[in-house]
Amino acid sequence: MKIITLEEHQFNKYAENHKYRSYYQSSAYGKIMKKFGYDIHYLGVIDDNENIIGASLLLYKEVFMNYKIAYAPRGLLFDYSNGALLKEFTERLKRLLSKQGFMLLKIDPVIPVSLHNATGKILNINPESNIIVENLKASHWEYHGPTLFFETEKPRFEAVISLDKDINTIYNSFEKRVRYKIKKAIRSGVEIIKGGEQNIPLFYEFVKKKYARPIEYYQEFYKQFEGNVDLYFAKLNTETFVINSKKLYEKEMEINDNLAYKIQQAKNANTRKKLINEKIESDKLINTYKKNLVWATNLLKENPNGILISSSFVLRYDHAAFLIIE
């Protein structure tokens, strides 16, 4: 076994086909981080026949007196199930990095442990996960444990929606509450539009207070993953909002008038009481719908072309769509 430096194309070829592949383990991501203060290195591991059996993008910085710390984002890309091979690799890597002035190497490979449904029920378990953890411990990697919050560089849990079904099946799989909110948004005039690189400043206005990254980070991300980044905006069509607000108000007015007529005609005390209660609720709705109509009308006057209300930054990688930020 030897540890070598890989050329960019060698690294990409290996990384793109590894079982633990991730967009974090790509030359594109490395170039992004290089622009923001990190040095990068493409590490490779070859066997006695010079076949590549492991690789990783390493990000590193000098911290003091020529000493450095390194991080392998969603790496190392290696067969952790082979305990003997992992131990040999770890020992060689430790000696090499120590000679080169590295104090610390952090890794967080994508090793699936289990798949849960929305309620937390376990649907599938990776039988290798416990073996891998024990092999890493035996090779003297310091295990951070099953973290629950934000103790690590990358999150322990990832939310996943399978998109291999038709759109109606996917929609019907959502909770009733979520489906209601989607329908309500559509009725209110919310539309989804796709943006481009020129719209990054607009996107940035939505996220700059939530996240510490500068706008240049997203511009560089878009550039390095060229052709695989999509910007989406939720836009309120103010004209549609007024039309639908008016419909709701007018419909409730009809219901209210009908209730008033029924109250006048009711001879039974219990029936009359029930109708009065229904009218009270209808009166409340009319008041709400009237306020919404006034608000919608003012929005239309001030924003005749609509209003952008939210945005998301999506990366398409390895037959999946990753929501980078929203």
Protein language model regions, located:
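Active-site neighborhood for divalent-cation/phosphate handling
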Residues: 155
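Acyl-donor binding region in acyl/amide transferases
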Residues: 67-151, 202, 291, 304-309, ...
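A conserved beta-strand-loop-helix scaffold within acyl/acetyltransferase catalytic domains
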Residues: 3-49, 53-65, 141-152, 160-166, ...
